[in-house]
C-alpha cells in the first residue's frame, strides 16, 4: 500500500506489476536523456553569438532529427506493446473470483465453490481497531492463495465502478450489463489495498478493496471453514 510521503509507485506484489515498474523506469531514463539534450541545445542557441546568414538548408541535420525520434519511439513502444498483451493474457487460472460493484460497496463470489459469497463494506472510523487503516479496511477481506493464477471477473449493478489494486497492477472497469475479466498472480503473502477508481457518486471514496494473500493450505482451510 502507499505509505506516508511516498512519491514512488507501490512495491510490486505480482510479476506484472514488477514489469510495469521496470517499464516506467526504462521510459523515465529515455525522457531524462531527451530533456537534457533539448535543454543543452536551447541554452546553446540562446547564449551564443554565431550567425549564419547563408544557411538555407541542412539535409543531414534534418535527417538526424527525423530518424532519432523514430528510433526512440520504437524503444518505448515495443516494451509497452508487450505489457499490453500480457495484461490480456489468461494462463489457466486456478480460481475465478467475481466482483460486483454497488453504490457503495463490493460483492464477491467464488465461482469454483458452492455458497461462498459475501459483501465487503468499508469499516467506519468509529468502529475501527487500533491496527486498521482509515478509509481502507473492510469488514470482509478477499482471501486468495499466493503463487497461483487468479482470474477476476468484474461487473456492476448500478453505475460504472473500477476495481483497482495498485500493488498487483490491476485496474479493470465494472460496467453494468457487461462482464470484464483480467488475471493476476500474487507472489508473496500479505494485505494489499485498493479502491474504486471511477467516480461513482457521493460515497465513491468509501469503496475500499482488501486482498489477504495466504498459502494454498491455509486457503483450503478457509474454504472448508466458510463452507461449513
Swiss-Prot record:
- The UniProt record gives the binding positions of Cu cation A2 as 196, 198, 200, 204
Q: PROSITE patterns from the xrefs?
A: COX2, COX2_CUA, COX2_TM
Major location, coarse class? mitochondrion
Q: Which reaction does it catalyse?
A: 4 Fe(II)-[cytochrome c] + O2 + 8 H(+)(in) = 4 Fe(III)-[cytochrome c] + 2 H2O + 4 H(+)(out)
Q: Where does Cu cation A1 bind?
A: 161, 196, 200, 207
Signal sequence range: none
Q: Which residues lie on this side of the membrane: Mitochondrial intermembrane?
A: 1-26, 83-228
Binding-site residues, Mg(2+): 198
Tell me the residue ranges located in the Mitochondrial matrix compartment per UniProt.
Answer: 49-62
| Major enzyme class | translocase
Role according to the record: Component of the cytochrome c oxidase, the last enzyme in the mitochondrial electron transport chain which drives oxidative phosphorylation. The respiratory chain contains 3 multisubunit complexes succinate dehydrogenase (complex II, CII), ubiquinol-cytochrome c oxidoreductase (cytochrome b-c1 complex, complex III, CIII) and cytochrome c oxidase (complex IV, CIV), that cooperate to transfer electrons derived from NADH and succinate to molecular oxygen, creating an electrochemical gradient over the inner membrane that drives transmembrane transport and the ATP synthase.
Family that this chain belongs to = Belongs to the cytochrome c oxidase subunit 2 family.
| Protein name (database record) | Cytochrome c oxidase subunit 2
Protein source organism: Yponomeuta malinellus
Taxon lineage: Eukaryota, Metazoa, Ecdysozoa, Arthropoda, Hexapoda
Amino acid at each position: 500500500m502507499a505509505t506516508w510521503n511516498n512519491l514512488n509507485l507501490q512495491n510490486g506484489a505480482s510479476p506484472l506489476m514488477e514489469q510495469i515498474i521496470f517499464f516506467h523506469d526504462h521510459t523515465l531514463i529515455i525522457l531524462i536523456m531527451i530533456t537534457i539534450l533539448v535543454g543543452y541545445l536551447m541554452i546553446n542557441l540562446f547564449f551564443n553569438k554565431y550567425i549564419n546568414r547563408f544557411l538555407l538548408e541542412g539535409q543531414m541535420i534534418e535527417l538526424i532529427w527525423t530518424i532519432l525520434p523514430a528510433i526512440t519511439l520504437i524503444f518505448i513502444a515495443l516494451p509497452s506493446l508487450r505489457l499490453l498483451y500480457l495484461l490480456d493474457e489468461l494462463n489457466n487460472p486456478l480460481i475465478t473470483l467475481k466482483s460486483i460493484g454497488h453504490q457503495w460497496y463490493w460483492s464477491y463470489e467464488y465461482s469454483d465453490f458452492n455458497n461462498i459469497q459475501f459483501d465487503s463494506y468499508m469499516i467506519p472510523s468509529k468502529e475501527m481497531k487500533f491496527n486498521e487503516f482509515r478509509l481502507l479496511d473492510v469488514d470482509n477481506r478477499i482471501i486468495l492463495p499466493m503463487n497461483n493464477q487468479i482470474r477476476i471477473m468484474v461487473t456492476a449493478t448500478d453505475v460504472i465502478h473500477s476495481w483497482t489494486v495498485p500493488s498487483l497492477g490491476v485496474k479493470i472497469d465494472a460496467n453494468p450489463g457487461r462482464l470484464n475479466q483480467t488475471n493476476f498472480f500474487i507472489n508473496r503473502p500479505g494485505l494489499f489495498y485498493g479502491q474504486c477508481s471511477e467516480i461513482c457518486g457521493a460515497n465513491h471514496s468509501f469503496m475500499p478493496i482488501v486482498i489477504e494473500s495466504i498459502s494454498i493450505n491455509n486457503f483450503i482451510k478457509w474454504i472448508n471453514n466458510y463452507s461449513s
